[in-house]
């Protein structure tokens, strides 16, 4: 294996492992986040299932964590065998999977961020009150979980770039092609 291929494979492995860790951390932080307040003898509990966007984030992060863990195993096995390049159909499958994971998680982050802003700031036009003034611990832990999910999403975008490079290098120039000077 060439040095550049080893470095790229190592970078991909580290990114995929970090995706698994950050996505799992986000999942744990969000799912375990609850806070109970007593309002005039009525118990009100804030939990992640109250906002559908956050449920979407939990599902997306669970899928991403498992997918990245499986791809990390594939990277380790490929590195041990010394095989870097794949067949075109397999490279297309990895590229498509990486793209799907990146888009899924970016969409989940965007939806959850909007819900978070509404929970923090409220919406006067719709008479929605600020929830985070009442459930401070809940909102803080949720913000940390969403930040972890954001880091996982950023790593997924970089993995998608590496995956695209690995795919399109299979379509590189051949020796039979004529080059035109510019």
UniProtKB/Swiss-Prot annotation:
Superkingdom of the source species: Eukaryota
UniProt cross-references to InterPro entries, sorted A to Z: CASP/CASPL, CASP_dom
Keywords of this protein's UniProt record, alphabetized? Cell membrane, Membrane, Transmembrane, Transmembrane helix
- What's the main place this protein lives? membrane
What is the annotated localization of this protein?
A: Cell membrane
List membrane-spanning regions.
13-31, 53-73, 90-110, 142-162
Cytoplasmic topological domain residue ranges: 1-12, 74-89, 163-182
Regarding the membrane, this protein is recorded as: Multi-pass membrane protein
User: GO cellular component terms?
Assistant: plasma membrane
Q: On the Extracellular side, which residues? A: 32-52, 111-141
* Subunit-structure text: Homodimer and heterodimers.
- Family (UniProt): Belongs to the Casparian strip membrane proteins (CASP) family.
Name of the protein in question:
CASP-like protein 2B1
């Amino acid at each position: 294996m060439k040095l550049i291929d080893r470095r790229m494979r190592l970078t991909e492995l580290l990114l995929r492992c970090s995706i698994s860790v950050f996505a799992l951390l986000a999942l744990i932080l969000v799912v375990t986040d609850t806070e109970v307040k007593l309002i005039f003898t009525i118990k009100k509990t804030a939990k992640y299932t109250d906002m559908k966007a956050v449920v979407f984030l939990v599902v997306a992060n669970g899928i991403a964590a498992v997918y990245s863990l499986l791809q990390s195993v594939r990277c380790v096995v490929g590195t041990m065998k010394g095989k870097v390049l794949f067949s075109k159909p397999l490279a297309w499958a990895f590229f498509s999977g990486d793209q799907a994971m990146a888009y899924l998680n970016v969409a989940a982050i965007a939806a959850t961020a909007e819900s978070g802003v509404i929970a923090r700031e409220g919406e006067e036009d719709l008479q929605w009150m600020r929830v985070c003034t009442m459930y401070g611990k809940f909102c803080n832990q949720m913000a940390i979980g969403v930040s972890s999910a954001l880091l996982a999403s950023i790593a997924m975008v970089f993995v998608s770039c590496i995956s695209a490079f690995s795919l399109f290098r299979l379509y590189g120039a051949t020796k039979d092609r004529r080059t035109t000077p510019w």
